[in-house]
């Protein structure tokens, strides 16, 4: 008797699960809600401005920086327009980035320095000459404002590295510290 009840139950289950009733599709209009920015959950992209993307080759050489440098020790052309192009293309959004940390953008020393690796310019942004001016190799104040506006429109924050402790190249005096300092 148990076998008969089990067989009838299984048959009923099988027959009802194979019905020809169609599933009705429901059209919904999803709403996008701006999520608050939370630094503890930020996905930060560290960006070396000069090395990222060259959006304007016309600003590649400024301040007479034409000396031949050691390999990868000179300016390579990355600039604000290049970063803006990548924001427009969705590069950062596709990676899930919501904050870009950029190397310093202030005007760098104009000449090169040899720290033992060959002629090197301040392409990295850490050899400040003028704290009140943007280095022309990276673009203008307007181009930087455009970059920030484009980033904000995509929910991306911009952070600038502020270097106050080591603002210039190594010198011969750097290793000479008074004995009571160490």
What role is predicted for each listed range?
Residues 1-4, 19:
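Positively charged n-region of N-terminal signal peptides that target proteins for export
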């Amino acid at each position: 008797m148990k076998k008969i009840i089990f067989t009838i139950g299984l048959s009923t289950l099988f027959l009802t699960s194979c019905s020809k009733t169609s599933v009705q599709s429901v059209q919904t209009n999803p709403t996008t809600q701006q999520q608050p920015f939370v630094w503890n959950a930020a996905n930060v992209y560290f960006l070396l401005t000069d090395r990222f993307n060259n959006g304007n080759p016309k600003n590649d050489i400024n301040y007479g920086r034409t000396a031949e440098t050691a390999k990868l020790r000179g300016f390579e052309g990355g600039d604000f327009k290049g970063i803006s192009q990548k924001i427009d293309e969705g590069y950062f959004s596709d990676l899930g980035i919501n904050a870009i940390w950029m190397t310093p953008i202030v005007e760098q020393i104009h000449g090169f320095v040899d720290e033992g690796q060959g002629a090197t310019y301040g392409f990295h942004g850490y050899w400040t000459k003028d704290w009140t001016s943007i280095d022309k190799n990276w673009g203008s104040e307007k181009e930087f404002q455009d970059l920030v506006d484009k980033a904000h429109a995509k929910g991306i924050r911009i952070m600038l590295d502020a270097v106050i402790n080591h603002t210039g190249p190594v010198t011969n005096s750097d290793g000479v510290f008074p004995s009571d300092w160490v």
